[in-house]
Each structure stands twice: as C-alpha cells, then as structure tokens.
Amino acid sequence: MRIIAGEWRGRPLVAPKGDATRPTADRTREALFSMLASRLGSFEGLAVADLFAGSGALGLEALSRGAASCLFVEQDRAALDALRANIAALRTSAAEVRAGSVMALGPTPQPLDLIMMDPPYGTGAGAVPSTSSAGSAGLVPQPGSRLRLPSRRMWS
C-alpha cells in the first residue's frame, strides 16, 4: 500500500495487523481520487475528514495532493497505531487524529470541504447518506461540500 500521487507519491503506508480492517486498495483509491479530481479540480486548501480512517490512506492521499488539513477518526486500536505511524513517517502537522466512534465525534474544529468514509463492510456504519446526516454526528460540512462513501458495488 502506498500514496498514489502528490507530494508523497510512492511513499509506503503500513496497514493494521490482523483482519479487523481491510485497507482500501491502491487501485480503488486511484479511481476514487481521479473521480474527485475531475469534480473538484484541485485538493489545494481543502479541509478533509477521513472517517473510519484505518491506516489513513484516504486522508493522507488528500494531504499529499494539497489538502490543508485532515481530521482522521478511528476507534480500532491496531488501526490507530498504523494511522499514527503513517502520519509520523510522513512528518505532517496537517493531520488531527481522534480516537473513538464516528457517531460520537463531536464538533469539528472547522467546516469541512470533503468528508470521506470507508467503513468496515457489513456493519451498517456507511448508512450516513448525506452531509446533513453527517452533521448529526458533529461534522460541520461547508455549504456545497461532498460526502464520499466507497462501496463494494462502486468498484466491482
């Protein structure tokens, strides 16, 4: 697993040990970010959230491509260890990690431009269908912001 593009292109990422989390494959991330780039134009200056962050691959990809900040939310201990190791290896101060449930997040420090969720399969955790619903979890989306949920159907 690696960063696909941007400042940290090609840098390896560690994944959590065990099978509690399944990191988003490089090809899936590449397709997702290609779609986002075609809609957003640029990631420059965006405030991003990576919910159910796991290793942080989605948020770190956004930071590598120019996002100003990323809020990572994860509750699995092994995933948090991998996430923190990846952030430390990239030496970025643009990352904020919150340990705990996405639904108990509380207010975000700033309005968000892009909210990405890649929840574990079969948990029903990806049932947040819009940015207005995300607001009920404490997220503060910017007007016109986007919520992206990779799904099994999208990539099969």
Residue ranges of model-derived segments:
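Class I S-adenosyl-L-methionine-dependent methyltransferase catalytic core
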Residues: M1-S156
